[in-house]
Amino acid sequence: WHNEEEVLPLFLKEIEKIYEVMHVKHNVEMEYLFVDDGSTDRTLMFLREQEAENPRVNYLSFSRNFGKEAAMFAGLEKASGDYVVIIDADLQDPPELIIEMYETLQTTDYDCVASRRVSRKGESKIRSFFARMFYKGLRKISKVNIMYGARDFRMMTRQMTDAVLSLREYNRFSKGIFAWVGFN
């Protein structure tokens, strides 16, 4: 994340609620691994404070902004759990879906439960048009079926996470990689 100091306390509060449910309902332990993508605000200071106070909080910090793909990859490399969740801290994705994602992975043969955007409300028509054309064009030139509206918010098994990490591309397009690695 980059310059998320204002939303991080709210995000952490929401994730703590998820932990309480997961711990009580499923006896699950969780680690929260934050990746600070070179923030210039107080994000890093907040993460340091939280790591000192909360044993579930860990973080990585980049010296400058390397971009979302690099931050996601670094987080996947550092994550050690049997299941790994990718979620942005801006609360645009509902953290409570983490519980449903976990329950789905526990009761199916899937290796990944991912979210997708079903509405582009609030976006300009031109942005929506280009987003549709991007996914349509990508599906035409690629053998990988990337779902329209695919988001990075997902939960993956360790096996799928390791498969994603085995692809060492420098210029990553994670949504494509998630679809290509061959897991359900």
Show which residues each predicted segment covers.
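Short, well-formed alpha-helical segments that are part of the catalytic scaffolds
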Residues: 4-23
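Donor nucleotide-sugar binding loop of glycosyltransferases
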Residues: 4-7, 39, 94
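Short beta-strand/loop segment that forms part of the nucleotide-sugar
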Residues: 12, 23-38, 60-61
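Conserved beta-strand segments of alpha/beta enzyme cores
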Residues: 31, 56-58, 184
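A conserved acidic beta->alpha catalytic loop
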Residues: 36-44, 91-92
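Alpha-helical transmission elements in cytosolic ATPase-linked domains
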Residues: 10, 14, 42, 46-49, ...
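Acceptor/aglycone-binding surface of glycosyltransferases and processive sugar-polymer synthases
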Residues: 49, 56, 60-64, 68-78, ...
